[in-house]
Curated annotation (Swiss-Prot):
Superkingdom of the organism of origin: Bacteria
Self-association and partners: Heteromultimeric protein consisting of LacA and LacB.
Gene3D superfamilies named in the record: Sugar-phosphate isomerase, RpiB/LacA/LacB
Protein keywords: Isomerase, Lactose metabolism
Single Gene Ontology BP annotation: pentose-phosphate shunt, non-oxidative branch
Its EC number(s): 5.3.1.26
Protein source organism: Streptococcus pyogenes serotype M1
Catalysed reactions listed for this entry: aldehydo-D-galactose 6-phosphate = keto-D-tagatose 6-phosphate
Gene that this sequence comes from: lacB1
Protein's UniProt name: Galactose-6-phosphate isomerase subunit LacB 1
GO molecular function ontology, one term from the record: ribose-5-phosphate isomerase activity
Disulfide bonds, paired cysteine numbers: none
Amino acid sequence: MKIAIGCDHIVTNEKMAVSDFLKSKGYDVIDCGTYDHTRTHYPIFGKKVGEAVVNGQADLGVCICGTGVGINNAVNKVPGIRSALVRDMTTALYAKEELNANVIGFGGKITGELLMCDIIDAFIKAEYKETEENKKLIAKIAHLESHHANQEDPDFFTEFLEKWDRGEYHD
């Protein structure tokens, strides 16, 4: 199984620890970045993880930023992604079993590294429980998606990266 993983600069260490854990369990890890502590913007890496999953490069995805809120919102904008921001086992299992989540999001400064690893392991092993109700709910959620052509523009995030470079965002 292939797992795509991405983060922002604030939680690079946490992402690397999760990546090492996944590799130790025998999973192939697609590291979508970031790779160091150079200041960057989390939507870039949420988008990369989401695209890896919907394009079939990865079976599932993991997104981590400081609180998890930003990167999880970003990855959920990729059509076909169903991501849940979780901090506990119950929420993660519900997301996979009932909503067929294909990405899981974390706040790397909120949820401890060992707990994240335990939750991710359980999430990967959990099975979607297909029911008519679940299928209808997922179809309704998918119906809300819309594709915006400008997202394919390689300069889509340039405006925000320039603001980062000018120091207009805080960590």
